[in-house]
Amino acid sequence: MDIDRIKNSIRNVPDFPKPGIQFKDITTLLQDKNAFKEAIAAFYIAFKDKEIDVIVGIESRGFIFAAPLALKMGCRFVLARKPGKLPSETIAEEYELEYGIDAIEMHTDAINKGDKVLIVDDLLATGGTAKATGSVVKKLQGEILSYAFLIILKGLKGDELLKPVPVFNILEY
């Protein structure tokens, strides 16, 4: 596994979307097939020995990593989406944004009682979206084994919000 290749494939965009932000652009990683393959391999190595029934990908960049990981691990893949994007009956959890409230939804039949669940997203910042996704999994009576992120912004302490559930990350800024 080549962590340096993964890290070097991510473009840093200063002052986006506003001054003072150092945006981590993963599109360059996705354009490098070997770096993308290394990222999926890093997730796989971390969880290959765990009994996971379902991998939940958080909209939208979480889908990019969760779907191939679910295929590689031989388990189900479930979408966690913004409100109004799923066509059947859903269950939701609201969470706070800097200027307002948003929500995350999943189909009510997406998780079975007792399913062991891994929740995947591209980046962990404050943890609000991941925590809300975990709340939906719990409402559906799934057991969260871990959260997994390509990138964690350690200074924002999102991992503390997700305790006591373990948090895995490939890169840290």
Identify what each model region corresponds to.
Residues 2, 131-173:
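PRPP-dependent phosphoribosyltransferase catalytic core
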